[in-house]
């Protein structure tokens, strides 16, 4: 039987949190460094710009790997990087456009591997939900940020 936590057990847990400033702690508090995020929104709603700003902030706390499966490194991606001055985090920010699930695992097993992994987008990665869960369990000290487009579910009339 799995352990059941009491309120006292939960209150006693300690977390290593991101010590970021007011701009980020007001809306998000101080999340655990190894928290997993799921960011979802409609197409063209500003997700990519927000996530690029978040990436830049996360570079203060460790290496960031941005898996740009949806956009690649197209002109829009390039302009966004220029606009947000991502050159200021040179050496802390890397972009990959076509890495497989297995290649990502190999990368994350290395000693100086990224601390923050952004998957943009979950749908385009073509990973199954169990793959994502297995990745987070295998690398529990890393932060995974999953970007998703809103999807409409259609149920045929009965």
Explain the meaning of each model-derived region.
Residues 1-11:
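Charged, amphipathic alpha-helical linker segments immediately N-terminal to NTP-binding catalytic cores
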Residues 17-31:
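Pre-Walker A adenine-sensing motif
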Residues 32-37:
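Pre-Walker A (Motif I) flank of P-loop NTPase domains
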Residues 38-98:
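Conserved P-loop
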Residues 113-126:
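Conserved P-loop NTPase "ATPase switch" module shared by AAA+ and STAND
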Residues 127-139:
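Conserved Walker B catalytic segment
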Residues 142-150:
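Structural recognition of the conserved hydrophobic beta-strand(s) that form the central parallel beta-sheet
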Residues 154-158:
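Conserved small/polar residues in nucleotide/adenosyl-binding loops
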């Amino acid at each position: 039987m799995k352990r059941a936590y009491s309120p006292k057990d939960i209150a006693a847990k300690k977390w290593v949190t991101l010590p970021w400033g007011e701009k980020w702690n007001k809306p998000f508090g101080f999340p655990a460094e190894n928290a997993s995020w799921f960011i979802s929104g409609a197409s063209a709603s500003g997700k990519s710009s927000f996530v690029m700003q978040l990436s830049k902030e996360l570079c203060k706390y460790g290496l960031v790997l941005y898996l740009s499966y949806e956009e690649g490194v197209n002109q829009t991606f390039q302009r966004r990087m220029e606009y947000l001055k991502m050159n200021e985090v040179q050496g802390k920010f890397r972009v990959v456009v076509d890495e497989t699930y297995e290649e990502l695992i190999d990368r994350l097993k290395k000693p100086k591997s990224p601390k923050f992994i952004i998957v943009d987008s979950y749908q385009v990665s073509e990973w199954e939900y169990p793959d994502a869960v297995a990745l987070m369990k295998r690398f529990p000290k890393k932060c995974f940020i999953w970007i998703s487009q809103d999807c409409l579910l259609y149920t045929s009339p009965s």
